[in-house]
Amino acid sequence: MSESGKSNFNIIIQKIIKKSLFTERQIEIILKKKRMLDDDFSLNITKGAYYRQVVQSRKKIEGLYYSIILLQGLDVISLDDSDVIFRLAEQVSKMYDNSDFMPENQEQIMSVIDNAVKQIVSL
């Protein structure tokens, strides 16, 4: 999150981040490391804090990939579930730069995502 407390992400992305394993700062750092944020984008943190967050983010991403491999390998996550997740991720990708959503649309979008995740997670 930027120094002023104002988020660099639209409402949908903010809500997804809150439900994810990552903090908004970690997502900003990941995007900066992947050069997906402007070069003039400033994180306003010390060099030590930045590198600590990079290491934490890398470990979380590794853990996430190992978890996906494990859960798919054990058929806890089916290929159909993965397909749903990837299609939702594609839609989120399209929303990343677009903050022009009406509030009712934002709630609808989050409801669709929440319902899809709950359906996939039901054990």
What are these regions (language model features)?
Residues R35-T46:
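Helix-turn-helix DNA-binding module
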Residues E3-K19:
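Short, Lys/Arg-enriched N-terminal segment that forms or immediately precedes the first helix
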Residues V54, I61:
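DNA major-groove recognition helix of helix-turn-helix
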Residues L79-L123:
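Helix-turn-helix/homeodomain-like alpha-helical modules used for DNA recognition
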Residues R25-K33:
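Short alpha-helical "packing" element that flanks the helix-turn-helix/winged-helix DNA-binding module
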Residues M1-S4, L71:
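N-terminal leader segment of winged-helix/HTH proteins
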Residues E62-I77:
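Short Lys/Arg-enriched helix C-cap and helix-to-coil transition segments
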